[in-house]
Structures are given as C-alpha cells and as structure tokens.
Amino acid sequence: MAYHYPPVQSAGIERTRHFLRYLPDFGYSAQVLTTSAFGGREDEGVLRAWEPLAAYRWLFNKEARGGRAPSTNRTRPGLLRRLGRLCLVPDLQVTWIPFAFWRALRALVRGKTDLIYSSYPPASAHLLGLLLKRQTDLPWVADFRDSWIYDPLDPELQESPYRWALETRLEEAVLRSADAIVVATEAVAEHLRLTYPKAAERIYVITNGFEPGDFPRSDPPPVGDPLRIAHTGSFSISHSQRTPQPLFLALKDMLADDPSWAQRLHFDLVGALSEEEQRAAQGLVEAGLLHLEGPQERAEAIAYQQRAHALLLVDHARPWVSSNVPGKFYEYLAAERPVLALGSEGMVQRMVRELQAGVFARADDPVAIRKTIEELYDCFCRGELAVRRDPHFLKPYHRRELTRSLAQVFDHLVQS
C-alpha cells in the first residue's frame, strides 16, 4: 500500500519506487495498491482505488492539480481545511481506506500473497494495513520512514489535543499489530523502542539512499571561482515548516557589512519557491549573490549539484530533538560535496557529524548561519572542501543494498 505513487511527482515516492525495482532481485514480486486521485494507468502491477475526497483536493490543492504529491502541511489553513483536519483523522486520505480495503481483499482472494507492506505517509496507509492484517492474518510490514507522533510531519497535530490523543492510540495499535516496523533513522527507532518496548525486537532501520548510477563522479569547480553552493528542490512548498528565510537574513547581513560577498559567494536555488520566498530573495538576486533557477528535470538538478562546491540542506528547527533526515541528504552524500546543513539538534546534526559530511547550523539562527558560511568560505579558500568518499563507505546507502535489507525482513517473516 503506497498512497504516493507515480504519476505523482514527489521525492517521497523514490523509496517505494526503488524497492519495487530491486525486490525481484531478491525473490519478491509486488503488486501496488495506490489511489486513483492523481490519475495514472492501472496495469497488472498497479491497482488504483477511488477515494471520495479526490475532488476536494483537486479543487483546493495546486500541487494535486499539477501532479505533485499534496503537501502534508499548510500555513494559515482555510476553514474547510481546518474542519477537515479536525474531522478526518489521521489525515485527509482516510476516505481512501474503505475503497482500498475492498480492492485489496479482492486482489488477495484472487492470488497468492506472502505478506503485506504499507508505506507512511499518509498514516491512513497504516490503518489500511491494520485492517488487512486483522482480516487476513498475513505478515504485515509497516514502513514508518519518519516519525508519526514524536516528530510529526503535520504541525497541526501538536495543536489539537484531541487529535494527538487519538493518533497516539492509532500509532500504538499499528505498533502492536505489525509483524515488522521499518523506520528510516536510528532516532525514530530509539524513540519507538522506548515508547513501545514490547515491539522493540520488531523494529528495523532501513535508511533512505540514492541510486549510484544517477551520480557519476565529477570534480568540483576550480577554487578560483566564487564559492558556489546549490540547493535542489523546494522549501515550504513541500514542507511548510522548512524555510530559507533565516538563510536570506544571514546573507543580507553579510552583504550589508561587506558588499564584496556578492563576488565571493554564489547560491543556486534549483526548484520551486513560494511567492513569499521569491520576494524575500529578490534583493539577493539583484545583488548577484543568489540565482533562482526554478524546477528542473532530475538530471539537470543533479548537474547543478555537480557544478557546486557545496550543497545546501534545509530542515526546520524544532523545540525538541529532531528524528528525521531529509532524503536529499543521502543524495548529497553521493554527489561528494560537503553539506551546509541547516536544521535543529537531532538526527541531521548527528549524521553530519558522524559521517563528516559537512557543517551544521541551527536553521532559525541567522547569526549562526552566517558564522557557518564564513567558516565554510575559509575552508574553501584554503582548498579544504574537496570530498572523495571510499565507494565502500557509500555502498550501504545504495538503493539495491537497502532493498536487500528489506527483503531480509520479508524473508524472516515469510519463513517463520
């Protein structure tokens, strides 16, 4: 069960797409159950279940109309959305469950199935998995990827005690019933093991990763050029809490103190920016320090990474220790460029430190961001930014190797 699936355009589908690509290498063929809300052809390997709220999202969500995965978050939600988030728990996709459930049951009756697998987000996919587990007693793998309750993708969850309490009970039901729980970071695993000790032995970490063929090795630009830093992808359009605004403030402060930074530093932002982000960036664009490229095909976005000396990663700051790592981080590892990571204390900071992947600053602190950029520039001037990673270091993050780990979880359940 993978709600987000092509033709949807989303970084989140890459994990599922590559699992499906490589599972046959390890003896598994899969049939996908997804939504019909975004169109797409139904064929032998893909079932698409109708959902009543598809029309609602098409009317009120520009990303859905454009074939992109709808953002899980919104700032300043309208009345309809606020009402929907109060009544439709755990998410708007809950109306997909009854139709997907019957579609799945028909498929299970017609063919031999060894196990079922559900992919979060949305959390409704896990509720669908829970229903199918109770109906069929087949082994069930629930892939949480990121945290549902502790470090939620949806900021509105923290603002509703009613939803928080209800969804905590739903998470508990999933953890109690799933035969295996897969997560994408050690921090998520540690939290779930502490919260649900009876499930501890059923929790497995399978990180996100990259496809090595997408990242041919390349040398960075010459040191004599300006320090070029690239970011590929969007900010608040895909995750409302992620914002480049503190970065922009830091850069404006640097320019105000020393206009020569416009010749020494250059940022390429390759991806969709909101109107608010574009307005905030305008002065930096006019100064020549910032270039807004807009959305690009994947190959061209990777080319921008390879033309850069360093790569920008932006996560949002939290008042607690973060548990999630943006999937972009692993692609940046493959690009073999140091990472300028902006986030909060937690998993991103931990990964940058443990893998010696680059430098880190808190995402909501323009002063710290400025200091970190200046330190990065000093390293650049000394010729100390070059990164060459041992291929064996990167191999555990290859998509095929990660699929091997998932297949081993499947093997354990099927054989037992």
Model-derived features with residue positions:
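Carbohydrate-associated surface elements
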Residues: S36, A187, I206-G209
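A short, active-site helix/loop in glycosyltransferases that binds the activated sugar's phosphate group
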Residues: E172-R202, Q349
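Acidic donor-binding loop of glycosyltransferase active sites
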Residues: D179, A287-H291, Q305-S322, Y377
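Nucleotide-activated donor-binding/catalytic signature segment of Leloir-type glycosyltransferases, i.e.
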Residues: D258-G271, E276-I302
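A charged, aromatic-enriched C-terminal amphipathic alpha-helix characteristic of glycosyltransferases
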Residues: D364-A368, C381-H412
